[in-house]
Amino acid sequence: MNLSTKLEVSKNRLNTFFPLRTKDERKELDWDSILGNVISEVYRKQLAVENLTDFQAMCEQELKQRLDDDAFWPVLKAMYFDSSDVLKIAPEFLLFRSEEAEDNKHNQRIGDMFVNLMGGKTLLNLSPMRLNFVEQILFDVLENKALKPEAKMKKRVFKEQPYLPFLAQCFKDDLAFLGSKPRYLLDSFQDFLRLYGFLYTSQLAHNLVNWSEGEPKPCPNYLILDTEKASAERKQLKESGYQQLYNHVLRIFPYLTMAEMLQAGRDEVRPLWLLADSIRNFDPATALLNDFAQSFKDERQLIKVQVNAQPDSISALRQVLQLSRDQFKTGNKDKDDINTNFAKATIKHLCADFIQQRGAAGSVLVMNQDYLLLLTNLVIGSNESLRLNELIKGFNQRGVFFDKQSQAEIVQFYERIGNVERMSDSGDAVYVRKTV
């Protein structure tokens, strides 16, 4: 049983399974810094130099030793350092991005979210970049002089198991594919992280609603292309689109903080769905949770809320989770705003690229062509092409759903860019090729 045997009501603290905190609405994410943090874990490399200026001095010294004419250095400096193009040589150079950000803890937590999706494992079998003569020298300086030897690297321990195993597997597969194409990785890594930030947030929110149904699975989350019209007649978009997402995001802070409270003192905080599985049909948990519900109601002064003795452990846990939401519906604006502001921060920081205002239709979930192409390439992966219905299944497995109207628009988009072929006279067998 993952439930603590001594349940005590405490402050709401969120330390697991989601990177944002209640005060993060006022902050801005630095995706370059997040990218640098993830690169450090993916490549298992850490900088030994303080900043890019120190690295520039190392490169100047090395290149002047190799160049016949010192006058070449200012030209190279302008090409690579003044323009920051040095950061585009290879993914490892993005390590410098993480050193540039101030007030970096929230960016570090976002980076940790992606590392947790990897299961704490690094991907060491990444294909090398093809570099020109000068770039190879700069890369060698980075590798041989500007990075810490492995013995001196800080080793971080990631105990947290993935909350969404299905999405963690997709993330690892997609990252492995990107690692086989380092130039594409370099060009698209930030978009890749932004995409998975949205996918993780939306699927976590939806699966928190289904906490009693066992291991999470992809939940309907309907988007349209950003070039489409959003009519009110599109049932799936209306029922399983933006409004559903926002309503479910409101559960992230209450449910996850409650899950931590119920596992206080345990060596590891398990996902809520695993906590539920561990107490199912376990009578002692029922009494513990019933007593805790009354204590929580009293401590939070939820006068208008009724608490009843529940007959089984899952019903008792359901009541406790409802109380976790009720504490932010008291009419006390300061208290109620805690969860509302957390939800706004979540939408702002991790979902904004995928939301548009559409007049009378209100907010809708959208995907632009850049993200669609990236997602298409990721799903096709090591294959040369995929049949359209298999591609759509791959979208769904990652938490991206399109109705039939959007699917038709997607095929038209593929035809315009020339990466689709029809393998039968009727045109029923549509295959989509990747663009990398």
Task: Outline where the language-model segments fall.
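Short acidic, hydrophobic short linear motifs in intrinsically disordered regions
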Residues: E384-R398
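Positively charged, polyanion-binding regions of nucleic-acid-associated proteins
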Residues: V366-E384
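Short amphipathic alpha-helical interaction segments
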Residues: V400-F413
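Long, internal scaffold/assembly segments composed of regular secondary structure
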Residues: L186-V307
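An N-terminal, globular interaction/scaffold subdomain
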Residues: N2-N210
